[in-house]
A protein has these predicted regions:
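Short, well-ordered, aromatic-rich surface patches in folded extracellular/luminal domains
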Residues: 2-14, 20-47, 104-167
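Extracytoplasmic/periplasmic/luminal assembly and interaction segments
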Residues: 49-99
Length: 167
């Protein structure tokens, strides 16, 4: 058997089956992913101090309620675009939101700190996280939560500005 024939045999018997297996394995993983954007339904985001979560957004209904700088509760309808939802879905995936614990609360309620409830709803599943700003868990987890919260708030502010400019 020549050297060229040996190389071809090696490629055909080891490398090609390995590549086929990789395509099959990762194809099944992507196909069966629990949180796919194609199955996305809505986002619910609430935050405030203690149990009074006065700032709320529900993308299913478009209801947006927040406390402004004068401590007045403002209610309005706010619709996000598909691009906004895709951005938030990808940002949540990048930050590992699907692996966050469901409750990330402070050990004691002595300090007055903001509490956030973030919920992503899909056809087959939902993921909800309750995050307390005074949570003393792993530093990377706290940072990921804070970054996701900032992204959600930024998208809501941009959508509010878009809506005001279009009127």
């Amino acid at each position: 058997m020549s050297s060229k024939a040996k190389k071809i045999f090696l490629v055909m018997s080891i490398i090609v089956p390995f590549l086929l297996y990789c395509v099959y394995y990762y194809g099944m993983m992507v196909k069966n992913a629990p949180y796919k954007f194609s199955e996305f339904k809505s986002i619910q985001f609430e935050y405030g101090y203690g149990d009074s979560l006065l700032n709320k957004y529900d993308s299913r209904t478009g209801d947006y309620q927040f406390v402004n700088t004068r401590d007045s509760v403002i209610k309005m309808k706010l619709k996000l675009t598909k691009d906004d939802f895709l951005y938030l879905h990808r940002k949540a995936a990048d930050l590992g939101f699907w692996d966050f614990p469901a409750k990330e609360l402070a050990p004691t309620r002595k300090t007055r700190s903001p509490r956030y409830v973030i919920q992503f709803n899909y056809q087959r599943k939902s993921k909800s996280v309750i995050f307390d700003e005074a949570y003393d868990g792993h530093e990377k987890l706290v940072d990921a939560n804070q970054r996701l919260i900032k992204e959600l708030q930024k998208v809501l502010e941009e959508a509010e500005a878009r809506q005001k400019n279009s009127k």
